């Protein structure tokens, strides 16, 4: 199947990752996946949420937002609305869960690492790109803390990355762009670690249900895409070792 942008059904969009995109963050990247662009930056604080005080355990959390003209029509800032939108809350919780799944919290001490994901251009897949980019930003932050003697070791227990898969015009397609995502019959977001385990599976039918066989095909295609993302991540993180 040839797609509108010339890709085959099993191809990711072109991906570029720029590490150290922000000078002041403990770790940061700009991830570009097709026309989708997200800045992922990490800040460390010497404190933890109330429920973790005096536990000796750290915390990783995330915030997600979109610039007003990251979208075709202006998206109102959450700050102007006076509250975080339900969509933003859902996405930032997903990002936080995904990152915590691959970190040994005890290795952080009583420190928090806050990951900010700011979408500067949205062409579908912003939440999955945020997860993939945030892993690298967090890796860079942890490496910096180890080099400074603040952390005694790298706290990661695995890699984590994410990708979207859609059923578009009856075809299962990897990493859909906006036009495909907008018209999709079914949308999936898949998060995996490099042990081949699923961290999260989100799947929603838009008017037409899907079969177990279709789900199996989606998972297989998504895993193949995520394996490619792991290799891209390693291209940034391994030179830091």
UniProtKB/Swiss-Prot annotation:
The record's listing under CDD domains reads: RNase_PH_bact
- Presence of the UniProt keyword tRNA-binding in the record: yes
Q: What is the lineage of its organism?
A: Bacteria, Bacillati, Chloroflexota, Dehalococcoidia, Dehalococcoidales
* Reaction(s) catalysed by this chain's protein: tRNA(n+1) + phosphate = tRNA(n) + a ribonucleoside 5'-diphosphate
EC numbers, comma separated: 2.7.7.56
- What's the top EC group for this one? transferase
- GO BP annotations listed: rRNA catabolic process; rRNA processing; tRNA processing
Q: Where does phosphate bind?
A: 87, 125-127
Record-linked Pfam families: RNase_PH, RNase_PH_C
- Name-wise, this protein is Ribonuclease PH
Picking any one GO molecular function of the record gives: tRNA binding
- The scientific name of the source species is Dehalococcoides mccartyi (strain ATCC BAA-2100 / JCM 16839 / KCTC 5957 / BAV1)
Alphabetized InterPro entries for the sequence: ExoRNase_PH_dom1 (IPR001247), ExoRNase_PH_dom2 (IPR015847), ExoRNase_PH_dom2_sf (IPR036345), PNPase/RNase_PH_dom_sf (IPR027408), Ribosomal_Su5_D2-typ_SF (IPR020568), RNase_PH (IPR050080), RNase_PH_bac-type (IPR002381), RNase_PH_CS (IPR018336)
Q: What family is reported?
A: Belongs to the RNase PH family.
Q: Tell me, what does this protein do in biology?
A: Phosphorolytic 3'-5' exoribonuclease that plays an important role in tRNA 3'-end maturation. Removes nucleotide residues following the 3'-CCA terminus of tRNAs; can also add nucleotides to the ends of RNA molecules by using nucleoside diphosphates as substrates, but this may not be physiologically important. Probably plays a role in initiation of 16S rRNA degradation (leading to ribosome degradation) during starvation.
UniProt keywords (A-Z) are: Nucleotidyltransferase, RNA-binding, rRNA processing, Transferase, tRNA processing, tRNA-binding
Q: How does it assemble?
A: Homohexameric ring arranged as a trimer of dimers.
Protein's UniProt keywords contain RNA-binding? yes
């Amino acid at each position: 199947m040839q797609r509108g942008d010339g890709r085959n059904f099993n191809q990711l969009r072109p991906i570029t990752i720029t590490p150290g995109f922000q000078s002041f963050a403990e770790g940061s990247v700009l991830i570009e996946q097709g026309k989708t662009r997200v800045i992922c930056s990490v800040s460390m604080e010497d404190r933890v949420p109330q429920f973790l005080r005096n536990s000796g355990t750290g915390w990783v959390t995330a915030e997600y937002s979109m610039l007003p003209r990251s979208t075709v029509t202006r998206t109102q800032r959450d700050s102007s609305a006076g509250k975080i939108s339900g969509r933003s809350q859902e996405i930032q919780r997903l990002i936080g869960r995904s990152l915590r799944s691959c970190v040994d919290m005890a290795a952080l001490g009583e420190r928090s690492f806050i990951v900010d994901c700011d979408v500067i251009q949205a062409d579908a897949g912003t939440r999955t790109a945020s997860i993939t980019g945030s892993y690298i930003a967090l890796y860079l932050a942890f490496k910096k803390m180890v080099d400074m003697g603040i952390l005694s070791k790298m706290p990661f227990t695995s890699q984590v990355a994410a990708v979207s898969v859609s059923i578009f015009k009856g075809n299962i397609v990897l990493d859909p762009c906006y036009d495909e995502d907008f018209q999709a019959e079914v949308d999936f977001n898949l998060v995996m670690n490099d042990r081949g385990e699923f961290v999260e599976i989100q799947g929603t039918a838009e008017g037409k249900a899907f079969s177990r066989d279709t789900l199996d095909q989606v998972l297989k295609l998504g895993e193949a895409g995520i394996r490619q993302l792991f290799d891209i991540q390693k291209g940034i993180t391994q030179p830091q070792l």
